[in-house]
Design a protein with these regions (language model features):
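Alpha-helical recognition segments enriched in aromatics with Gly/Pro capping
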Residues: 2-42, 53, 57, 71, ...
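Short coil/loop linkers at secondary-structure junctions
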Residues: 70, 95, 117, 236, ...
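Structural preference for alpha-helix termini/caps and helix-kink/transition segments
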Residues: 283, 291-488
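Short, glycine/charge-rich beta-strand/loop segments that flank catalytic centers
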Residues: 78-81, 104-107, 117-132, 150-159
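Short Gly/Ser/Thr- and Asp/Glu-enriched loop/turn motifs at secondary-structure junctions
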Residues: 118, 148-150, 477-481
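The substrate-binding groove and active-site-proximal loops of carbohydrate-active enzymes
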Residues: 89-96, 120-126, 243
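N-terminal, positively charged nucleic-acid-binding surface of large information/translation enzymes
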Residues: 17, 22, 27-115, 484
Length: 488
């Protein structure tokens, strides 16, 4: 895979092997094939969902910067038929397509506000019924699936010896999911539905002709991703991502379906899962009712960019406790970044440092100046398992040195940093009119101190806290981050 020598290669934790591995395109065309599970469009996505989508967005941006936009193919699906969408149609008394179209539009608007690039392809489950039926018939022909007495079709888990490799779940430990109510129709309680026979009292008018020998009905949840990946990306993809809640059973089932239908071909060469967002120490979810939507937060006066920034403040593979205090800190940080960029933009061209790039024949950026050490540190942090808190720490180290420093980044390099993080600085919203203005120097020191704490560099963390105190501010640690308050 051709790459620039400007920064270290992108490496990412692989949930299957439990190791850090470099990302690489596997096909001869050099195109990196990347899939992430999208939303179920029956209600607004909450910011816990968007944490995962923002993580995927940063991955997409880094890959495009590294390989070129034409060498990345990103697919994200929309689940527009499943138990929850159908339940919502019964609840509202409206057609399925009308409800899912409404929430799809809302999801797209929120993604745009949060700065997420749209996928290259966004297939829907209802738009790929034929592909799902074809895959189910393939599995039935190969003996991996069977028709139950009620006309449904189930995947026979014991036909796939590698089942559980991703989640490390053994057969005796398999969860009995909410499909257990249909266990009378299964060969084994752990088998999962590929096709659900039509039930008039539950499904209303939602049904399609089934696979050969099966009843009319609708696809199960898991088969859609396998079918859409095969159609739009092929039998083997380079990266599959999603939230940790999808690791089992959804992603485990995808592997089983795809590899059985495709003759054992590796389904995904790399798996990455982001962790839960917490509220008051509890996982944020619609079922618990303890969630924020983007609209909830913008109604309180916070900008979408502040939400994005706050969600970047914790490592994607670690749980992050979300608070409104973190949004206040994010708004202030964004203001500091705006001011810094304005100073860079105002510098005469003659003041810009002259640097020579280290290049190789494979580099696509041979004519660009070499990045400053600060910019290099930031990208290396992102390339090292998406270490976003370390990247933000490196960003504010740059800012703290000042726009006039001899090693200040060029405006082009700073804009490349902003692109990688997906931070749009064009909007400026003051959500804390009564709060005293925090000096840029204090904010920068606080970001550095937080990064030092995360790195367990206690000596540096204590020294930075003392510097903050000397400037008249108290930095108070919280589970999810920190707050800054003027000292009395």
């Amino acid at each position: 895979m051709p790459r620039s020598t400007r920064y270290m290669a992108i490496q990412l934790y692989d949930s299957l092997t439990r190791t850090l591995k470099p990302l690489a395109a596997s096909q001869l065309d050099g195109v990196f094939r990347f899939y992430n599970c999208g939303p179920t469009v029956y209600a607004p996505a909450h910011i816990g969902n968007f944490r995962t989508f923002i993580v995927n967005d940063i991955l997409r941006r880094l890959l495009e910067l590294e390989l070129g936009a034409d060498k990345v193919h990103h697919v994200r699906n929309l689940t527009d038929v499943d138990d929850r969408t159908i339940q919502q149609t019964r609840k509202e008394g409206r057609p399925l397509a009308e409800i899912t179209a409404h929430w799809t539009a809302k999801f797209h608007a929120d993604c745009d506000a949060l700065g997420c690039l749209p996928p290259h392809v966004e297939p829907t489950a209802t738009g790929h019924i034929r592909e799902q039926v074809d895959m189910i018939e393939c599995l039935m022909e190969r003996g991996n699936a069977y028709r139950a007495a009620d006309g449904s079709v189930y995947f026979r888990i014991n036909s796939f010896p590698d089942y559980g490799a991703l989640s490390r779940i053994k057969d005796r430990e398999l969860k009995i999911t909410n499909e257990a109510a249909d266990s009378d129709h299964k060969d084994s309680v752990s088998d999962f539905a590929l096709w659900k026979a039509y039930k008039p009292e539950e499904d209303g008018d939602v049904q399609w002709p089934g696979p050969r020998g099966a009843a009319a009905g609708r696809p199960g949840w898991h088969i859609e991703c396998s079918a859409m990946i095969k159609k739009h990306l092929g039998e083997t993809i380079d990266l599959h991502t999603g939230g940790v809640d999808l690791l089992f059973p959804h992603h485990e089932n995808e592997i089983a379906q795809s590899q059985c239908c495709n003759g054992g071909t590796t389904f995904a060469r790399h798996w990455y899962h982001s962790e839960h967002l917490l509220v008051d120490g509890t996982t944020m979810s619609k079922s618990k009712g303890n969630y924020y939507t983007l609209s909830d937060l913008t109604a309180k006066g916070y900008s979408p960019m502040a939400v994005r920034y706050a969600l970047l403040s914790g490592h994607p593979r670690k749980q992050l406790n979300f608070t409104l205090d973190s949004l206040h800190a994010a708004e202030r940080a964004l203001k500091t970044l705006r001011n810094f960029r304005a100073k860079l933009a105002a510098k005469p061209a003659s003041d810009l440092p002259s640097r020579t790039a280290e290049t190789s024949p494979s580099s696509t950026r041979a004519s660009e100046p070499a990045p400053t050490k600060g910019v290099e540190a930031l990208f290396n942090a992102l390339h090292d398992d998406l270490n976003t808190p370390a990247a933000l720490g490196a960003l504010f180290t740059l800012v703290n040195r000042g726009a006039d420093a001899t090693d200040a980044p060029s405006l082009a390099d700073f804009d490349r940093v902003l692109f990688a993080l997906g931070l749009d600085l064009s909007e400026a919203k003051n959500v804390d009119q009564a709060a005293p203005e925090i000096p840029a120097e204090v904010t920068a020191l606080a970001e550095q101190r937080w990064a030092a704490k995360l790195a367990k560099d206690w000596g540096s963390a204590d020294a930075l806290r003392a510097q903050i105190a000397a400037l008249g501010w108290a930095m108070r640690d919280r589970k999810d981050g920190y707050s800054l308050e003027p000292q009395n």
